[in-house]
């Protein structure tokens, strides 16, 4: 499909601008704001009839505002006769609410949001490192889940690692850690065994694996309060780890994240720009950001030209 147009909400303006620059296009002209009562107000200020439209919007904090911006923009574009609408969601919020645990009386909010997107008229979704890949099955439209972790891996190769070992911060992240370990010449793995007695709190129980005098690479899909990673780093250092690096795609950094990172034993935290960092986080000396703009721009180009997305990750 030709006549590609890019639009952006207010969640990741710098990333959206960078993607547009990589594709040699200008961001579409749209007014995205609020009425005096807080309701989302959107107006598309250019012709989009028949166009292949991409909306770049993370559903990060403020989550509900950014979510509503996205769906209201989709509705405005649909009513303006856009040919195809792809939601580019670098960070997909509500992804952690993807199941009912032991039949507890809770919603599966990831499914609710997926249904919301389908019903409003989104034709396709492009996202990065979903918290659980099976969330793709919640959608009634095609979903491309690209791997920001490969950008992180490329950065790992630039660090002078001494006797590295890849560490999963919990049992659930073993598959992700194993994939990174395989890319790093089948290096060894360790696992942090933790318990989570309640939300946003975890307790490290054991370190499974030998980390003495080794550079430890903690890998995760996101950092929220940072409590898990900081506890993991402390446990690794107590067991003689030489250095501890933490790599994660999505920098949520909520709650006590700043305090946790300031007081942590992590030598460096490396994240991607799927969520904008607050000024105080940006000023932390042990936090560094990598951009996904080139990868997302290439994925958008391939979708628009009906080319394979999986081919991006076959080498």
Swiss-Prot record:
Stored SMART domains: Pribosyltran_N (SM01400)
Cofactor comment: Binds 2 Mg(2+) ions per subunit.
Subcellular location: Cytoplasm
Family note: Belongs to the ribose-phosphate pyrophosphokinase family. Class I subfamily.
Pathway annotation from the record: Metabolic intermediate biosynthesis; 5-phospho-alpha-D-ribose 1-diphosphate biosynthesis; 5-phospho-alpha-D-ribose 1-diphosphate from D-ribose 5-phosphate (route I): step 1/1
Molecular function terms from GO: ATP binding; kinase activity; magnesium ion binding; ribose phosphate diphosphokinase activity
Keyword annotations: ATP-binding, Cytoplasm, Kinase, Magnesium, Metal-binding, Nucleotide biosynthesis, Nucleotide-binding, Transferase
Summary of the function given for this chain in its UniProt record: Involved in the biosynthesis of the central metabolite phospho-alpha-D-ribosyl-1-pyrophosphate (PRPP) via the transfer of pyrophosphoryl group from ATP to 1-hydroxyl of ribose-5-phosphate (Rib-5-P).
Kinase as UniProt keyword: yes
Positions annotated to bind Mg(2+) 1: 131
Protein name, per record: Ribose-phosphate pyrophosphokinase
Swiss-Prot/TrEMBL catalytic activity: D-ribose 5-phosphate + ATP = 5-phospho-alpha-D-ribose 1-diphosphate + AMP + H(+)
Pfam families noted in UniProt: Pribosyl_synth, Pribosyltran_N
Residues reported in the UniProt entry to bind ATP: 37-39, 96-97
EC number: 2.7.6.1
Originating species: Buchnera aphidicola subsp. Baizongia pistaciae (strain Bp)
EC main group: transferase
Subunit structure of this chain's protein: Homohexamer.
């Amino acid at each position: 499909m030709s006549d590609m147009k890019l639009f952006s909400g207010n969640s990741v303006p710098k990333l959206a601008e960078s993607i547009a620059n990589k594709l040699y296009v200008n961001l579409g002209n749209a007014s995205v704001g609020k009425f005096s009562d807080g309701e989302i107000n959107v107006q598309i200020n250019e012709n989009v009839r028949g166009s292949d439209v991409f909306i770049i919007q993370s559903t990060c904090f403020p989550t509900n505002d950014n979510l509503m911006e996205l769906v209201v923009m989709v509705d405005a574009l649909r009513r303006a006769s856009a040919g195809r609408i792809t939601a580019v969601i670098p960070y997909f919020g509500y992804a952690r609410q993807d199941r009912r645990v032991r039949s507890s009386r809770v919603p599966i909010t990831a499914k609710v949001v997926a249904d919301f997107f389908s019903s409003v008229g989104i034709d396709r979704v492009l996202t990065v490192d979903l918290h659980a890949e099976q969330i793709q099955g919640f959608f009634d439209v095609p979903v491309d889940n690209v791997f920001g972790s490969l950008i992180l891996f490329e950065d790992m190769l630039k660090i002078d690692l001494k006797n590295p070992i890849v560490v999963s911060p919990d049992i659930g992240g073993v598959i992700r850690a194993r994939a990174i370990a395989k890319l790093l010449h089948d290096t060894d793995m360790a696992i942090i065994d933790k318990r989570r007695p309640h939300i946003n709190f975890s307790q490290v129980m054991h370190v499974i694996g030998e980390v003495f005098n080794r550079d430890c690479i903690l890998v995760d899909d996101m950092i929220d309060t940072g409590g898990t990673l900081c506890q993991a780093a402390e446990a690794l250092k107590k067991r003689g780890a030489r250095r501890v690096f933490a790599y994660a795609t999505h920098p949520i950094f909520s709650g006590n994240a700043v305090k946790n990172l300031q007081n942590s034993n992590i030598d460096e935290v490396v994240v991607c720009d799927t969520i904008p960092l607050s000024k105080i986080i940006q000023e932390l000396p042990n936090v560094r950001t990598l951009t996904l703009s080139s990868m997302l721009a290439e994925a958008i180009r391939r979708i628009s030209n009906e080319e394979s997305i999986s081919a991006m990750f076959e080498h």
